[in-house]
Amino acid sequence: MNQAMKKAKETFAQGNYTCVWCRDNELLTSKEAGLRPLLTRIREGKDLSGFYAADKIVGRAAAFLYVKLGAAGVYAPVMSRGAKELLTEYNIPAEADELTENIRNRQN
């Protein structure tokens, strides 16, 4: 396992974060819910290409955003099969503890 991915996963597991991104010695964290952490990074114009991410839950929408942001790899305790397939299609390694058919939003 890549050292940056390992650090992202360890930080995610130890903290109360919804997202952790790691690239080389750079570590970013977020406690925002849903897609907000990813959308915030896009809106701010942050260069996150080549980072490894550990995210609480990854569905297809989040997977599309990770592709747009240039992720080098994505881990989530829960990931939809569609998200894993999409990330794999873009040659982004995807790892999950549990794969599910769908990710539902808070209202559903």
What is each residue range found by the language model?
Residues 1-77, 97-108:
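Conserved mixed alpha/beta catalytic, RNA-binding, or beta-rich assembly cores of soluble enzyme
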Residues 71, 91-92:
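A short helix->loop->beta-strand "cap" motif at the edges of active sites that frequently abuts
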Residues 78-82:
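Short, polar loop motifs at secondary-structure junctions
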Residues 84, 93-95:
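A generic, well-ordered mixed alpha/beta core segment in the N-terminal half of proteins
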Residues 87:
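Short, polar/acidic, helix-capping and beta-turn segments at strand->helix junctions
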